[in-house]
C-alpha cells in the first residue's frame, strides 16, 4: 500500500485593522494644509479607494499580526499550543531582528515551533502561504499560522499624492492544517530582480520606524503594465498545473493594488467581476495584508464557501509575483 498524500488545508482565517479610518475627504483636507491638491473624486476615479485604516503611533506590525492571528486561531478552533509553524509576510517589521514571527509567537504564548518572516512586499502573503504549504506537505509542520501584516503608512511620503493616497495598514491571517483531502492544489512563485527600481523603498528599521531614505518610490505606469502581464500568465500556469480551467474558479482573490488593475486582470482572464473579491475600496492597498484581508472578508460574509475553488494572487516590489490555488 502506498503512503497517503498529505495536503495543507485552510482551516480558518482572521483579520485586524487599526481603529482609525481616514476617508478620502479627510486625507484631501489634511494634504490641502500643505498646498497639495487632491480630492475624493480624483482618488476614486484612479484607484477605487474610498478610505483606509491607519495605525496610530506605537501600533506595530507585530501587534496587528498578533490580533489577526488570534482571530484566525479562533475561527479554526485551534489553540496556540498546537501551532508548530508561524510565517509572517511583511515589509514593515518591528525590528531588523528578531523576526516579527518570533514576536507574534511570544505574544500568542506558543513555543518551540519554527517562526520566521518572508519579505516579498505585496506578494508576501502568497510567498508565505506557498512556503507553509510545502512544510505541511513534507510533514515538517502539522498546523501553520500564515500572516500578512503591514504598517505601510510609516514608509509613505505624505507630500507625494501619487503614492500616499494608495496605502493603508492592517493584517490578515490563515491557519493551515494537515489533511487527507486536497486543500492547496498548486502554487507558483516568481521574481524578476532586474525590475527592482520600479517599486522600492530604502531606509533602516527601528521598532517599526524607518530612518534614512524611508519613502516608497513607484513608477505607477511600469508597475501596472508589469502587474497585469505577470498575473495573467501566473493564473493560467497555476491552473494548468492543477488541471483546472479558469472557468471553474469560484473566486479570484488578487492583491488589492487598485481597482483598475483588478478590473483589467479580470477581463484578461475572462473572470466575471462578480467573482472577484474587492476590498481595496475600504482597505486601500495594504501590501502583504491585502490578500488575507480580502479572503477573510469574503469568508466571513458568506461569499466564499467550503468546497469552492479560490485563486489567490500577489504582485509587488522586487519585482515579485505568485499564485496559490486552493479548495476551501
UniProtKB/Swiss-Prot annotation:
| Entry function | Catalyzes the condensation reaction of fatty acid synthesis by the addition to an acyl acceptor of two carbons from malonyl-ACP. Catalyzes the first condensation reaction which initiates fatty acid synthesis and may therefore play a role in governing the total rate of fatty acid production. Possesses both acetoacetyl-ACP synthase and acetyl transacylase activities. Its substrate specificity determines the biosynthesis of branched-chain and/or straight-chain of fatty acids.
Reactions it catalyzes: malonyl-[ACP] + acetyl-CoA + H(+) = 3-oxobutanoyl-[ACP] + CO2 + CoA
| UniProt record, GO biological process | fatty acid biosynthetic process; secondary metabolite biosynthetic process
Descriptive protein name:
Beta-ketoacyl-[acyl-carrier-protein] synthase III
Active-site residue list:
122, 255, 285
Q: Name one Pfam family in it.
A: ACP_syn_III
Q: Where is this region: ACP-binding?
A: 256-260
UniProt keywords (A-Z) are: Acyltransferase, Cytoplasm, Fatty acid biosynthesis, Fatty acid metabolism, Lipid biosynthesis, Lipid metabolism, Multifunctional enzyme, Transferase
Q: Please state where this protein is localized.
A: Cytoplasm
Protein's organism: Bordetella petrii (strain ATCC BAA-461 / DSM 12804 / CCUG 43448)
Main location per UniProt?
cytoplasm
- Per UniProt, what is the name of the gene that codes for the protein in this document? fabH
